[in-house]
Amino acid sequence: MTTHDRVRLQLQALEALLREHQHWRNDEPQPHQFNSTQPFFMDTMEPLEWLQWVLIPRMHDLLDNKQPLPGAFAVAPYYEMALATDHPQRALILAELEKLDALFADDAS
């Protein structure tokens, strides 16, 4: 299985987790919310919105078009800080993000 395949499976697992716990939204953010220059669109989106509307679709776009994946990639550290310590699915979300990050660490070595 290629790195692209493993990344796709992990993105699907992350999406399934967000859907299972009702963190997947049907209402798309306003167009101006995608114009952020901040990492993770901190100034225009909530952390889980960014996963749904930015990270997951952009990564799928790279995969679908057989483009190179980012060399340096780590989102879990941001989510360790961004998700409230009492968020009910914090540990589950962080675990899935750490698995995603590990795929890029493995690919870099």
Curated annotation (Swiss-Prot):
PANTHER family: CYTOPLASMIC PROTEIN, CYTOPLASMIC PROTEIN-RELATED. One of its GO terms (biological process) is single-species biofilm formation. SUPFAM superfamilies: YqcC-like (SSF158452). This is Uncharacterized protein YqcC. The gene is yqcC. It comes from the Bacteria. To the N-terminal of E.carotovora exoenzyme regulation regulon ORF1. The C-terminal part is colinear with YqcB. To H.influenzae HI_1436. Pfam families: DUF446. InterPro entries: UCP006257 (IPR007384), YqcC-like_dom (IPR023376), YqcC-like_sf (IPR036814).
